[in-house]
Amino acid sequence: MEDADFMTEIFNGADIVYVMETLGAGSFFDQNLDVVAAITRIGEVYKQAIQRSGVKRVVHLSSVGAHMDNGSGLLAFHHNLENILNELPKDVSIKFMRPVGFYTNLFAFIPMIKTQGAIVSSYGGDEKKPWVSPLDIAAVIAEEIEKPFEGRKIRYIASDEVSSNEMAAILGEAIGKPDLKWLVIPDEQILKGMIASGMNPQTAKGMVDINTSQRGTELYKDYNRNKPVLGNVKLSDFAKEFAKAFDK
C-alpha cells in the first residue's frame, strides 16, 4: 500500500476500486512510528495510483469521526484520508463508508474480563452508542458497489445502538457472568497501562483520545445528523461469537 507504482499497476483496468488502510502487526508498539502520519502517506499513494490508472469509481472505508479535524485521536487519519481523496478530479466519483465502532474490537476485553472480572475503560455509562458488525459493513459495501456512482457520497454504517452498561450485561450473560460490569477509570490510568505494556506513547495517547472523544458529543455529531438504517447483526448476535472466543 506504500508503493504508488505497484498500486497503479493493481488499479489499471479496474472499473471500481475499494480502498482501506492498515499497518503491519505490532505497529502500535513501534517506538519510532507516527501511526497517523504513516497511514496518511498511504492515502497519498492511493490518490496517485487512482490518478495514474484512470479509475473513475472509488469506494473508501473511512470511519465515524472523519468529519473532525481535531480531538479524535488516532481517528484523525480518516479525516486526512478523506481530504486527500477529495483532492482527486471531480470526474472521480467516491463513496466514503463511515462505519462506527466494530463489535470485533470487543474481543480485546476478553483477557481483562478473565483477569479482572470486569470491562475497564475510560468511557462508559448509560448513553447509547452505535456499534457495527463487519458482516453489515460488507453488505453495505456490496450494495454501494452495485448502485450508480455520482460525485462524492458519505454513508454511515451501524448495526445496533447500545450503552456500555447494556453491553456488559449482554456479553456477561453470554459468557456465564451475568454480573459483569463496565467500569470507568481515568484516561491517565488507561494511558499508563498502555505505555507499560510497551505501546508507543504517542500511539497510546491517540488511542486514549478516541475514548475521550466518545464521552463528548462531537464524535457522533455527524452520525446523529445522518443516521443510517441499522444492519441485521445485533449485539445479542455477536455475543454468541464473543462467548465462543471467551471459552477458547
Annotated model-derived regions:
Residues 2, 132, 162, 230-233:
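Residue-level signal for the nucleotide or nucleotide-sugar donor/cofactor binding architecture
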Residues 174, 187-248:
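A hydrophobic C-terminal alpha-helical subdomain
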